[in-house]
Amino acid sequence: VIEQKRLFFIDAIRAWAIIMMLQGHFIDGLLDPIYRNTDNNIYNIWLYFRGITAPVFFTASGLIFTYLLFKETDKSYRNKRLKKGLIRAGQLLLLGYLLRLNINGLFKGEIYPSSYYVDVLHCIGIALFCIIVLYYLIGKWSYWGFALVAVLISVIVFIFEPLYINLTLDSWPIFLSHYISKAHGSVFTIIPWLGYSTFGAFLALLLLKFKSFHKFYPVAILICILGGYLLKYESSDFFIWVRDTIEWPLLKNVAAKNYLFMRLGDVLWVLAIFMGLRNAVTHPRILAIGQNTLSIYVIHSVLLYGSSYNFGLYRFFKQSLTPTEAISGSIVFVTISVLLSFLYVHSQNWRSQIFSRIFAKK
């Protein structure tokens, strides 16, 4: 029981992140542009939390998967986790494309360009696959080797962002270019977001290694607070100092637009908050939200964007709501999405019985 409780705050983080993602998508898509005023402190606070949601979500995804993978040393257990991870990665990729597939276009014999856009599900699926590959290459043989390479991937992906952020990859097949470049319409790309997932994998191994130490949580919270501060407020000056020391011009660009490392600082602060609240976020409903983020995400996509049939709220209320309407609407929207997810999960046994009867051997 004690071992399981140490994961409660991770599920709580995932619950918070998916709720923030849902309300962010709702308000961003339906709020009238005339109310998007950066001179308004309330709007700026909302904008800040919207900005940290994706980094937190990607980090938590890498953290929980790696934690469960390395939790036991038994070979059969790990093989089971790896198989489950591969299936989930494939499921995420498939769902990512299905949610963007336009049925009306298919009836016309067309596949619209937006059907190939890469979104958050694609990126998490690829991130899980990369973590699995990293496990087979290094993790099977070296615990700390895996951790070191994982955090190095994060640092490299973030530092070299100025070199790939504006790539168009026009010579690539459009299907593949969407994974690297936003030039043709993708919402997310593998890089730099992979860096947050591998950083989560790194944190998972630290958690597993040191969680049994005396005063682990107070020390971990302090480290996250200090680390977050350094990343948010000191990392730009650090990159400038390194650039001047070794004369590496790239670091000037990193320091000028240092959002990736600064968001990583935000991630550490969120971790610190939830570790501090670990004994207060153990309600079964909170944990259930964190454990069912995929179904919640899919349901919200269908309700808000209409997904494959293009008949969602976005079609009727696109950028037309007042702040009061957007805020109250987002509360209702999040509540309905979560409740429908719970209904879907609770009907699993019933659905399994129906399918088993349909496909039962006569």
Place the predicted regions along the sequence by residue.
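Alpha-helical transmembrane segments and their immediate juxtamembrane cytosolic regions
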Residues: V1-K362
